[in-house]
Amino acid sequence: MLFHITQTHSPELCPKDDGGSKTLYNPKAEGVKLLAIYGAFPEHVIYYIVEAEKIEAVEAFLMPGFKRCTSKITPVSKSPIVN
């Protein structure tokens, strides 16, 4: 199952000077394959596309950012929408 994750933090909690955006997720979370990361840095928002079978695995992936971010997890279709 694919998930689109929108992770947002405030400017005051920005990780830029504290290890960067890589400190906001666990790349070794069991059961999660990270497919893409995109940033809207002026908005303090990071977007992830991950593949996982269980939501608990996605939550473990996001655990490092729980104290400084909010996250919206949305299941998405594996089939692209093309006109």
Regions found by a protein language model. Give the residues of each.
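Conserved, structured core segments of small domains
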Residues: 1-83
